[in-house]
Design a protein with these regions (language model features):
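A helix-centric hydrophobic-segment signal that preferentially recognizes long
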Residues: 1-153
Length: 153
């Protein structure tokens, strides 16, 4: 039972990794569209994304997940400033399509975070109960940490 619950937690964080990766891909595509309006700033943001991006897997920590989302939020804020300087960017249909996808993956990420936290709650409860607590110790299972609620723009 503990093994299945642990697999559920790992599966949930893997799903978060997929959502983050897709969110990064769509953000990069939007930035490529924005290059037509402000090459320097768009290239700097693309470089920032490429430098800080990392893959989230079942062995990733909640801190790593939060760092990745904070990074995306930071780039989105800078991109928003660029759009204020060049409002015609919003008229680019491809840019708008990619930004809608960034938002959509953000909502999916929020849902995946809720699923992850629910899986962690069930697992942590099971790990604390006797006799499972004894078995968990022998098998090397420890309580998992929760993810903060991700608020995507």
């Amino acid at each position: 039972r503990l093994t299945v619950m642990n697999e559920n937690v790992e599966s949930a964080i893997n799903q978060i990794g997929v959502q983050l990766s897709s969110r990064y891909d769509m953000l990069a595509a939007a930035l490529n569209q924005a290059k037509d309006y402000d090459v320097c700033m768009a290239c700097n943001l693309i470089a920032k994304v490429n430098f800080h991006r990392c893959v989230i897997t079942s062995v990733s920590t909640t801190g790593e997940v939060m760092e990745q989302e904070k990074m995306i939020q930071s780039v989105l804020e800078e991109l928003e400033k660029m759009v204020r300087q060049h409002p015609e960017i919003n008229e680019n249909k491809d840019y708008s399509k990619f930004m809608e996808a960034v938002d959509s993956y953000g909502r999916m990420l929020q849902t995946s975070t809720l699923i992850y936290n629910d899986s962690v709650t069930k697992f942590n409860r099971a790990v604390c109960m006797i006799p499972a607590k004894l078995i968990a110790g022998i098998m090397g299972f420890q309580q998992c940490s929760y993810l903060e609620n991700i608020r995507c723009k």
